[in-house]
Amino acid sequence: MVIFNIEENFKVVEEWKKDEFPAWILMEEDEVNLLEKMFSYECINECIDYKQEQRIDCFKDYTFILINIIEQVEKQIISKELDIFLGKSFIVTVYKSNISLLYDLIEDIKEEKNCQLFKLDKSPSIILYYILDRIIINNYNIISDLETEGDKIELEILKDPESKHLNSLLFIRREAYKLRKLIKPIRYIGDTLVIDENEVIGEGNKVYFKNINSKIEKLITSLDTLSQELAIVREAYESELANKTNELMKVFTIITAVFLPLELITAIFSMSFESMPFKTCPYGFYILVFILSLMALILSLIHI
């Protein structure tokens, strides 16, 4: 567990008492029982359990948020649960596995990088704002990566469609579906924070969470656009595959058109009639081969 004094430029302190000073407390899941006197048993239990649904609950003097941090590992999307308790004088973040986003935020705050709001207000709700803002940016970057991968596959499909392209496309669509399931609930978290039923955010800071809500809407719009683009890529694959099949059928049609008359002639000459042209001619075979070859050449030129 790490306790930061927000007012003293995030100085690490050993102890903290409620309302003593604004604090940011980072905890691992096995330490969350230390806060059982401050928060409800249900919330504490959800911090320990895995695979809980994303949610937000407003209590008398704090708000509990369960949200997923999305990451890409070898192109596969995984989620890491982050539990947040927000009060007027504290913010507690509980994580089950290391989340680099939090520590990157701490470093940026100490270096006064991309965190200028702290010059105006060093409150826990501003920390929550920056956490959510970075989650949204992180999610948008993942969507952008999937879009780039989809565009790359589309270009390869237009050059030469292969079955591997379909497998890659299906993988991206599966990851996009997983991403949609993880991102959609964030919209309801944003709406609840804007309402601020228990007033832990404060009227002055609501404007920042309205901005978060706007970013969430844009994020979901980007996600919808990604789904549409992947559908277009799938259509492009099917179209190119159909064109390739049509070209192949065209070749078979030409072959059939060329050899069908030849087969008819050879079938006639294979009949057991005594009186048959070229049958008694010494050069009949060669003449017939020449005629058949000439016909094949003429028919090929006509169809090509």
Identify what each model region corresponds to.
Residues 1-195, 202, 211, 215-218:
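Peripheral, non-transmembrane regulatory/ligand-interaction domains of membrane transport proteins
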Residues 52, 163, 186, 193, ...:
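Flexible domain-boundary/linker segments
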Residues 120-121, 193-209, 227-242:
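Hydrophobic alpha-helical transmembrane segments
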Residues 217-304:
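Hydrophobic alpha-helical transmembrane segments and their immediately adjacent juxtamembrane loops
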